[in-house]
């Protein structure tokens, strides 16, 4: 039997209308929809896709448990188990569409599965999605970077000082706001934030003074000198 193909599909930041035509077409033709959550109904990426393609609810769902932990051993076991589950479906000749938030190549746990499946010789393809930082700048109505400015995309593992010392524009993702906001005020930098970009509960904070310290997990700061 010919092996199936794995597609890693970015659904964008939250607005189902920001899903690309290719993402919609792949999801529509796939035999199996894989999601990075052991409880599919709680998966943000799947819920976004369902708003664009309600018929996905009739497809076979493959939940992949991706634990929120910093324990490297637990993560490696989860990645191995997730890749094995995907390969089992591919061995059955199924086309698998793995849905992931934003773009699959930007801080996505999908990549750890993709690497394992591709290394095992299975056909794979990554379908890009609209990154959250591009959608956030658009929602705020501001340029992300211009006039030769450097752009730094910074995960929450960086300290505020490390991030703010970088030149140009900084995008701070999933950061520690109670620690970051005082550092921002002291630096004199300009900052804006989008919480839950593209989702129904999206909130825009165009200035540093408006940014609350208790914003949610899906918050993104754009910092300019």
Task: Identify what each model region corresponds to.
Residues 13-16, 39-40, 157-159, 174-178:
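Short beta->alpha connector loops
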Residues 44, 101, 128-131, 157, ...:
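Short beta->alpha linker loops
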Residues 6, 163-225:
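A contiguous loop/helix-start segment that scaffolds small-molecule binding in enzyme catalytic cores
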Residues 35, 62-65, 126, 146, ...:
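Structural signal for conserved beta-strand scaffold positions within catalytic alpha/beta enzyme cores
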Residues 1-16, 21-122, 206-212, 219-220, ...:
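Class I S-adenosyl-L-methionine
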Residues 66-72, 159-161, 199-202:
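A short acidic, often aromatic-flanked loop/helix-cap motif at beta-alpha or helix-coil junctions
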Residues 105-166, 212:
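Class I SAM-dependent methyltransferase SAM-binding "motif I" and its flanking Rossmann-like core
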Residues 40-42, 69, 131-134, 199-201:
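Short gly/pro/ser/thr-enriched loop/turn and capping motifs at secondary-structure boundaries
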């Amino acid at each position: 039997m010919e092996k199936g193909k794995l597609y890693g599909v970015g659904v964008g930041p939250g607005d189902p209308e920001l899903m690309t035509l290719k993402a919609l077409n792949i999801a529509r033709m796939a035999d199996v929809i894989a999601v990075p959550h052991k409880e599919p109904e709680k998966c943000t990426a799947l819920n976004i896709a369902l708003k664009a393609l309600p018929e996905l609810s009739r497809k076979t769902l493959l939940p992949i448990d991706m634990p929120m932990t910093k324990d490297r051993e637990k993560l490696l076991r989860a990645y191995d188990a997730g890749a094995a589950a995907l390969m089992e479906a591919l061995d059955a000749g199924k086309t698998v569409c793995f849905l992931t938030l934003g773009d699959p190549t930007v801080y996505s746990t999908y990549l750890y599965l993709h690497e394992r499946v591709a290394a095992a010789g299975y056909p794979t393809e990554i379908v890009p999605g609209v990154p959250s930082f591009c959608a956030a700048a658009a929602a705020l109505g501001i340029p992300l970077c211009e006039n030769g400015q450097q752009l730094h995309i910074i995960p929450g593992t960086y300290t505020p000082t490390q991030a703010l010392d970088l030149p140009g524009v900084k995008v701070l993702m999933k950061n520690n706001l109670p620690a970051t906001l005082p550092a921002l005020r002291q630096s004199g930098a300009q900052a804006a934030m989008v919480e839950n970009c593209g989702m129904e509960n999206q909130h825009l904070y165009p200035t540093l003074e408006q940014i609350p310290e208790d914003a949610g997990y899906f918050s993104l700061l754009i910092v300019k000198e």
